[in-house]
Every structure is written in C-alpha cells, then in structure tokens.
C-alpha cells in the first residue's frame, strides 16, 4: 500500500510539472460587446480579439489576448 501512495504522489507531481497553469488563456478585458465580432475594433495595442464574455463578472466585455493579465476561467 505504501508503494502505491508513493507512485500516486510521484505521478501527481509529474503531471503538475509537465502541465503548468501558465498555459492558460490570459485576457485583458476591454470595452462592451454582445457578440465576439464586436470585439474586433475594441482590442488595443496589437492584442488579438478572442471572444465576448457572456457570463461571470466580466459579462459583456471583450477578452483581448495578451501575455500578462487575468487568467480566463
């Protein structure tokens, strides 16, 4: 039983190291939108429009992709 626990802990550690959270989508929330097409002209400073958020605290705002910012959940 002890060997199984060590194996499981090692497997979980490996997964955490191989798949870090840094691969999550990162957004800068800008403007107001109803559809994702509305975000094309909203995103500034070379950011790519990603989607119009339709729920949660950022409802009705455009998610503009960037390198540092809020993680989209």
Swiss-Prot record:
Record-annotated disulphide pairs: 27-64, 33-52, 39-62, 43-63
Signal peptide: 1-24
Keyword annotations: Antimicrobial, Disulfide bond, Fungicide, Plant defense, Secreted, Signal
Main location, first listed in the record: secreted
Pfam families named among the record's database cross-references: AtDEF-like
An example Gene Ontology CC term for this record: extracellular region
Any one Gene Ontology BP term: killing of cells of another organism
Intracellular or extracellular location(s): Secreted
Protein family membership: Belongs to the DEFL family.
Protein name stated in the entry: Putative defensin-like protein 277
Organism of derivation: Arabidopsis thaliana (Mouse-ear cress)
């Amino acid at each position: 039983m002890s060997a199984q626990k060590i194996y499981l802990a090692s497997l979980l550690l490996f997964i955490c190291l191989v798949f870090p959270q840094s691969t999550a989508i990162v957004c800068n929330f800008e403007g107001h939108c109803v559809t994702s097409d509305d975000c094309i002209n909203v995103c500034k400073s070379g950011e790519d429009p990603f989607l119009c958020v339709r729920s949660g605290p950022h409802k009705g705002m455009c998610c503009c992709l960037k390198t540092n910012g809020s993680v989209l959940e």
